[in-house]
């Protein structure tokens, strides 16, 4: 597998709608002139943005966290430009961008150092061949203080790897449970 360059990412986004909406260059300043956490195309990746829809984890129901039977009431829904994550807690969000991954491609997503250096960890699983949808993002606040996440700014970088051989079975072929997801998607079994 080889990592794909900015030229390939631009070509695939423009001709195959691999990323929508798409920023062909790095964006570091907002439309009103403010400095922001960068997003858009980088040398060998694409920096994704967080939308303004969040699910903030709370344990008001004193429930047990069970990935096979997750209680949706464990979250508080929030919509806004800045999400405050409680100390030692987490929040879910989704990307602004909608992805359509080619059959020969697998992605790996890594959190941006701007957040990591503040104790905020971004976790995303790989985007599998022929998966499509908005990406659900998980932000862990590892600090003993509240932490901010900024909507419509960069939060993580997606790296695209192309195989020299097409996979036998893609995510779409398997009927993956997160195929075509919109909005923040909770665990499914």
Swiss-Prot record:
Keyword Nucleotide-binding recorded: yes
Biochemical pathway: Pyrimidine metabolism; dUMP biosynthesis; dUMP from dCTP (dUTP route): step 1/2
GO biological process terms, semicolon-separated: dUMP biosynthetic process; dUTP biosynthetic process; nucleobase-containing small molecule interconversion
Catalysis performed (reactions): dCTP + H2O + H(+) = dUTP + NH4(+)
Domain of life: Bacteria
Active-site annotation: 138
Pfam families: DCD
InterPro entries hit by this protein: dCTP_deaminase, dUTPase-like_sf, dUTPase_trimeric
Residues noted as binding dCTP in the record, renumbered to the chain: 112-117, 136-138, 157, 171, 181
Family: Belongs to the dCTP deaminase family.
Stored HAMAP family: dCTP_deaminase
Role description: Catalyzes the deamination of dCTP to dUTP.
Name of the protein in its database record: dCTP deaminase
